[in-house]
């Protein structure tokens, strides 16, 4: 659930709550939906504006054709790569790239990134076949992650295309994760698997992620579609 709130630091403030009631710092898919909501319901006439989140101030830009929002490009800011800032236990200020993590008796290679929230990226041979339902919770609550973690299981198709499935902290398996897609794009570059611009295929659709070398900012572009409207009773 997303809340639209006033901000003294940005044009708007966004708060996010997971299905288990916990509050998240950021949601990449959420901020695209948030941006479209502001436009469609007349809360802003701007095509680009600032949003205060738990991960800092982010800048969505609406892509509009014939008066309709066709997509949203979001400047997601700089990725955080230092272990203790993500946080991941035992790495201090070092980066966590292709480091061992043992889950249920098997060792995997993890690359960890924060996009305002923690992510553990695991590259796998076959994303469809990976037992995400059996192992996802064990990654999320692993002792290496003091604030738990989101975990992305990623199959590299080529240097511009990856297939990603995600176990989200506080929400389990979801159809897509915007910050997870950004973390995946960064991890692909850090491990030499992908280019700086990559298409991420998720269960719920596709996102384009670009880690800009000049600014060190990550840009995410994707759709935001109206599914339904409703009212919550008092």
Task: Pin down the residues of each PLM region.
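A glycine-rich beta-to-alpha transition motif near the start of alpha/beta enzyme domains, typified by
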Residues: 1-68, 120-234
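Active-site glycine-rich loop that binds ribose-phosphate moieties when present
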Residues: 80-109
